[in-house]
Amino acid sequence: KVTRKGGGSALPWKTELFRGIVRSAVTEASRKGVPVTVKMRVGIDAEHITYLEAGRIAEAEGVAAVALHGRTASQAYSGQADWSAIARLKEAVTSIPVLGNGDIWSAEDALEMVRQTGCDGVVVGRGCLGRPWLFADLAAAFAGSEVRVRPGLREVTATLRRHTEYLVDFYDGDEQRACRDIRKHIAWYLKGFPAGSTVRHQLALVDSLQALDDLIGTMDLDVPWPGDAAEGQRGRAGSPRVVALPENWLR
């Protein structure tokens, strides 16, 4: 829906349009002292790579930082992110921070990305789904600490409950809407925990805070962190695809 209209990863292909948008955003935001950052992918597909030129344009137009996800739009989240592209962007863009993104599932992944690419920091996406404590792990890792957060099921479900409460507030008290929203996060929160298929199915249909509380109450909350079973990829990987673009966009 985004690239079909020339947005997202399609936009940097039109370099002057991209330049104009970045310039306008930086100019207007600077009036209020707001920094502008640009996050992008490697390109549209393997034949239409845009990130190096887009990074240089963004740098020249005064953005505060650039972030790169090491996949093309056509890859979606399939395969592995190409961290070497982040390294090449870091070599090309020298006056502002370059942030890396893609396949950061743990603090150790973040440290390894920085080691391999020389990037100035990382951006986390799918890795924090159902796992907001990942940011505490990242902060500890970059501070040189080996301490990692490993919550048991009691703490995880309490975090899930609090997340749902925040959604209720966000939706102005609409519990049903909030619960519909939280459903997609439940499997990520419970990844690796022995919650049972029946409870998981019922949680996927939850429609109120009370229903959520009742189902959490049926679980053995003394279960500790499940270790490797809770680690690894989160979210859908998807499959490579043809990117929808406006007519004649690549000419």
Question: Where do the PLM segments sit?
Answer:
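A short, structure-level motif marking secondary-structure boundaries and short turns
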Residues: 7, 38-40, 70-72, 95-96, ...
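Active-site mouth loops of central-metabolism enzymes
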Residues: 10-13, 37-51
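Alpha/beta catalytic cores of nucleotide-metabolism and tRNA/nucleoside-modifying enzymes
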Residues: 16, 20-23, 27, 31-35, ...
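Active-site beta-loop-alpha junctions enriched in small/polar residues
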Residues: 39-45, 69-73, 103-105, 127
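Glycine-rich, proline-tolerant flexible connector loops at the mouths of alpha/beta enzymes
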Residues: 1-13, 68-78
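N-terminal small/glycine-rich loop or linker at the start of catalytic domains
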Residues: 1-8, 25, 29-42
